[in-house]
Amino acid sequence: MIISINKKKARLRRAARTRFQIKKLHLIRLVVHRTSKHIYAQIIDSKNALVLTSASTVEKEILNLVKYTGNIHASICIGKKIAERALMKGIINVSFDRSGFQYHGRVKALADAARESGLKF
């Protein structure tokens, strides 16, 4: 139990450090959060603290596309969807905020799918 608390504290410390640097530069950021069953992505304007668009595996539109929401295939769908919604709003350049999670697996799949769909990090 102690190990998981320390891992979470370390992840949150990494996330805070990244967010501070991004907020200081007033960039639009693509924030990713993952749980064991779902993955969430939001595009946030750091200057005004507004969520510009979002996508997650909780949405019915995504649930119809994937069989299970906690895998790489679901992350790829979310990456494509968030890029599509961002491009519709005229957002092309974003800063990637992985929320302290390792850039591996589902987080990497989401980032790669968003890049392939037209977002620039």
Swiss-Prot record:
Cross-referenced Pfam families: Ribosomal_L18p (PF00861)
A single MF term (Gene Ontology): structural constituent of ribosome
Classification via Gene3D superfamilies: 3.30.420.100
Alphabetized SUPFAM superfamilies for the sequence: Translational machinery components (SSF53137)
Keywords: Ribonucleoprotein, Ribosomal protein, RNA-binding, rRNA-binding
Example of a GO biological process term: translation
UniProt similarity note: Belongs to the universal ribosomal protein uL18 family.
Assembly mode: Part of the 50S ribosomal subunit; part of the 5S rRNA/L5/L18/L25 subcomplex. Contacts the 5S and 23S rRNAs.
Protein name: Large ribosomal subunit protein uL18
UniProt organism field: Buchnera aphidicola subsp. Baizongia pistaciae (strain Bp)
Source taxonomy: Bacteria, Pseudomonadati, Pseudomonadota, Gammaproteobacteria, Enterobacterales
